[in-house]
Amino acid sequence: MWSDIETSKDLLGYSIHASLLKDVITNPKNLPITVGLYGDWGSGKSSILKILQEQLEKDDDTVVVYFDGWSFENFDDAKMALIQGIVDALESNEKFFAKVKDDAKGAMDAVTEAFVKLKKSINWMRMLKFTTKAALPVASAVISGGASIIPTLISVFQENKEHLTDILTGDKAEEFLQNAINSEDNEKKYKAVREFRTDFEALINKSKQGRIVILIDDLDRCLPRHIIDNLEAIKLFLNVPKTAFVIAADQYIVSNAIKSEYKTIIEASKEDRHHDNLGEAYMEKFIQLPYILPKLSPKEVETYVTLLFCQSALNEQDFFKSTKRFHLICE
């Protein structure tokens, strides 16, 4: 019986996918970027992330952090949990400090102080109750464009929701959004988002690292609301220069989760010819590069099973030779 967990041992020739993704996210011209690694459950997404992680960790200019999206499932405030988790992971990552630890004492202190400031910002945002549905959509609209959060805004501003899409995509979009953030409460939240983004970008620059890569697995196993929360947290708070996110998920499950979360909106806008594609359109606003894994052919499945039997029958040295020959043949 074989283990049903991810592995960095490449028996399927998936290193080519990891290498292609590495080339994309290590190119400074492409950053910031969010990549969607799409495939069915059991298609090998998690293994590709592990292989990619190993490749990236060999790069002196890259700090990589791996997250299981499901690990935040028990938190009510999924947005803040993800942000806190990423900040904590960077703070505990020795490589993040590697380029400043031998510099003058001031450089190391600057990074440490930046972490303290970010943590205070997170606590402040928790106090502002960013879990409420109005604040983040409005701030997101101003930062990343109104159309990207139309579904959320419709769920918040129930009045005139039939006309909200037209308002946000028309000539009066800027005026509408500005009026929406003019309340004192939303003004504080909008300012907090801006300050966090500025401080997070400053932290990365002070570390002197070339890029920060966040690998997020199993997003599609989260509850629909948490799937959306995680995507919005990445786009709104963390998508700053020198960052790359690779999110492994079944795109159809994520899309259906979005449709499920906003099913009342879809019902209310049936006359809109775009409502059937709401899930896909919503995802496109967060994912710049969709990378879809091809399904295995029967021949590839046969080869994989053969290699599994070889792995169980051969010692480690002989099996390594066998897989090396296999990869040479594939090339």
Language model regions located:
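Short glycine-/polar-rich loops that comprise or flank the Walker A/P-loop
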Residues: 32, 60-63, 210, 240-244, ...
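Conserved nucleotide-binding/hydrolysis micro-motifs of P-loop NTPases
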Residues: 41-43, 71-75, 250-255, 263, ...
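P-loop NTPase nucleotide-binding core
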Residues: 56-201, 206, 270-271, 314-316
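Conserved AAA+ ATPase small/helical "lid" subdomain
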Residues: 103-132, 283-331
